[in-house]
């Protein structure tokens, strides 16, 4: 009995010691100018901007996992597409009169040009090294079948020729030509099937995880930058002087510390919403989140991989979210080519792949529960789509693959669970709540804290998204001559549009291609194509989009 009592006493003393150590550690306050929460591409990009704009500012980055770029930025957890609307048909919706709207496509392409310039600048500075390790030329293709879809693609191609950003795109309805572009897609296909494709040679495959690792490795070379891994934010509290005290737990030894920061960026992917809510700023009350995961079929068989060099996107079926369309993609991951097909939607209440099953429930509040209910009621087709995706069998997924690769063999493919994407639900005065595709920077009025919510186009537009954040929270500094000069050195086209300026477009594409080691030839005259037959479109209920 005495031994048991002694043992219990020793355990109590030990636990008390750990608790006291944690409190003591928490009382030791670390000070920093900028706190970056999350070790993904958004935090890495913002940190890289600020390092060049204000090299004397101290920065601290905290990451919950044991390494950076292990969640959504990880190359295996996303599609690795340099989203520039060259092939993604959801960025060019069809109007009621049958015409094609290209405004969104132009905006997406402009944004990706900023990312290309940002990365090229970092290569020139030696921050990013060996461009082939993170970006490679992979042609981007759109591929459709059926008379209505062919007519849509024909009209899309014609509309995009109005923009200097889409020069060099080619169009074909010829089976032999499309087979030359994408053999896997055409071999074994019915020769009588009506098909069409566009192809743009300057498309890219991007390893965002590698970019993130290299950017953070460069930041770590400076003494006023600190990276803390296995560190989870437990509390955020605004101080009277508008600084923030952030409590961070060390997940390895159980201790905690307080970090006092002048500015806090929440770039924690799916976890950003909960942390934004934890901050208590009123702007957070407008938002809720709904998690959707994605799966891909993966082939590493050389007979498959070496027979396909393209990212091929199709058109979503009627009633399905526009971004849900499957695509068969060449990827370059860790120096090795693979082919991915998907995505297939999955559901989990986790907000992160390495998150908690309680994430959805714990982020639901009295402020956002009604917007969530409105979104569910207003988008029943989306709910049905997600349920149908979750119910897919192995055979169902393989049949979907065969629509894009008719001669596919089951033994060449395995299923891979990619990352989680938290869709933005925002309070709306008219509808109660709306599902928002895209990313959104949410900040307080004082510009002392900001969070990035949303999922698409995400990593491919990290550079322009963080530019937007700088303008939103550091407006006075951004307008200063010093910051203006630095930003224009980082992004030569900063402050002006490339669209409509052929010379400027070609100059920037030539520059970034040379620095990043990408293929680029001056575009030739556009292909002659049959004139699109614009047909009035039946009025259809708008389908909410989601990012997979």
Swiss-Prot record:
One of its GO terms (molecular function) is flavin adenine dinucleotide binding. Residues 521-548 are annotated as: Disordered. It comes from the Bacteria. SUPFAM superfamilies: FAD/NAD(P)-binding domain. Keywords: FAD, Flavoprotein, Oxidoreductase, Tricarboxylic acid cycle. Residues 530-541 have a biased composition (Low complexity). Belongs to the MQO family. Its cofactor is FAD. Pathway: Carbohydrate metabolism; tricarboxylic acid cycle; oxaloacetate from (S)-malate (quinone route): step 1/1. Its EC number is 1.1.5.4. This is Malate:quinone oxidoreductase. Pfam families: Mqo (PF06039). GO terms for cellular component: cytoplasm; cytoplasmic side of plasma membrane; cytosol. GO terms for biological process: tricarboxylic acid cycle. It catalyses: (S)-malate + a quinone = a quinol + oxaloacetate. PANTHER family: L-2-HYDROXYGLUTARATE DEHYDROGENASE, MITOCHONDRIAL. It comes from Escherichia coli (strain K12).
């Amino acid at each position: 009995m005495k031994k048991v009592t002694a043992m219990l006493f020793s355990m109590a003393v030990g636990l008390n010691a750990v608790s006291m150590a944690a409190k003591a550690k928490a009382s030791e306050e670390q000070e920093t100018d900028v706190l970056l929460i999350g070790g993904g591409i958004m935090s890495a990009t913002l940190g890289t901007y600020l390092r060049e704009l204000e090299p004397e500012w101290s920065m601290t980055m905290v990451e919950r996992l044991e390494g950076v770029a292990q969640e959504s930025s990880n190359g295996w957890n996303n599609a690795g597409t340099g989203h520039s609307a060259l092939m993604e048909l959801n960025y060019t919706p069809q109007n009621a009169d049958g015409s094609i709207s290209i405004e969104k496509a132009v905006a997406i392409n402009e944004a990706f040009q900023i990312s290309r310039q940002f990365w090229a600048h970092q290569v020139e500075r030696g921050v990013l090294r060996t461009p082939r390790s993170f970006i490679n030329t992979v042609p981007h293709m759109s591929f459709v079948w059926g008379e209505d879809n062919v007519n849509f693609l024909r009209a899309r191609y014609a509309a995009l020729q109005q923009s200097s950003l889409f020069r060099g795109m080619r169009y074909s309805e010829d089976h032999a030509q499309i087979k030359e572009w994408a053999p896997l897609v055409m071999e074994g296909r019915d020769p009588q099937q009506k098909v069409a494709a566009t192809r743009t040679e300057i498309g890219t495959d991007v390893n965002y995880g590698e970019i993130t690792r290299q950017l953070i490795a460069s930041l770590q070379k400076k003494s006023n930058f600190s990276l803390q891994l296995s560190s989870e934010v437990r509390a955020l509290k605004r101080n009277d002087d508008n600084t923030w005290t952030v409590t961070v737990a060390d997940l390895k030894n159980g201790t905690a510390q307080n970090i006092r920061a002048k500015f806090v960026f929440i770039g924690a992917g799916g976890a950003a919403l909960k942390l934004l809510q934890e901050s208590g700023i009123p702007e957070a009350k407008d938002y809720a989140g709904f998690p959707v995961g994605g799966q891909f079929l993966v082939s590493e068989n050389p007979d498959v991989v070496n027979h396909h060099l393209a990212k091929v996107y199709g058109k979503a079926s009627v009633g399905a979210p526009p971004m849900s369309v499957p695509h068969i993609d060449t990827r370059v991951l860790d120096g090795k080519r693979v082919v991915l097909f998907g995505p297939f939607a999955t559901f989990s209440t986790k907000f992160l792949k390495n998150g908690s099953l309680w994430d959805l429930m714990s982020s639901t509040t009295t402020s956002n529960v009604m917007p969530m209910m409105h979104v569910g009621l207003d988008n029943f087709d989306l709910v049905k789509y997600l349920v149908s995706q979750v119910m897919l069998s192995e055979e169902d997924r393989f049949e979907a693959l065969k629509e894009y690769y008719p001669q596919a063999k089951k033994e060449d493919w395995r299923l891979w669970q990619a990352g989680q994407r938290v869709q933005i639900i925002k309070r709306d005065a008219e509808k109660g709540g709306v599902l928002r595709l895209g990313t959104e920077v949410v900040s307080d009025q004082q510009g002392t804290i900001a969070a990035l919510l949303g999922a698409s186009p995400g990593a491919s537009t990290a550079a322009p998204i963080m530019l937007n954040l700088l303008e939103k929270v550091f407006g006075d500094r951004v307008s200063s001559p010093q910051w203006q000069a630095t930003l224009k050195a980082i992004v030569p086209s900063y402050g002006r549009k490339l669209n409509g300026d052929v010379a400027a477009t070609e100059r920037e594409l030539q520059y970034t291609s040379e620095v990043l080691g990408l293929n680029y030839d001056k575009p030739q005259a556009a292909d002659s194509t049959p004139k699109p037959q614009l047909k009035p479109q039946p009025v259809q209920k708008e389908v909410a989009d989601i990012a997979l």
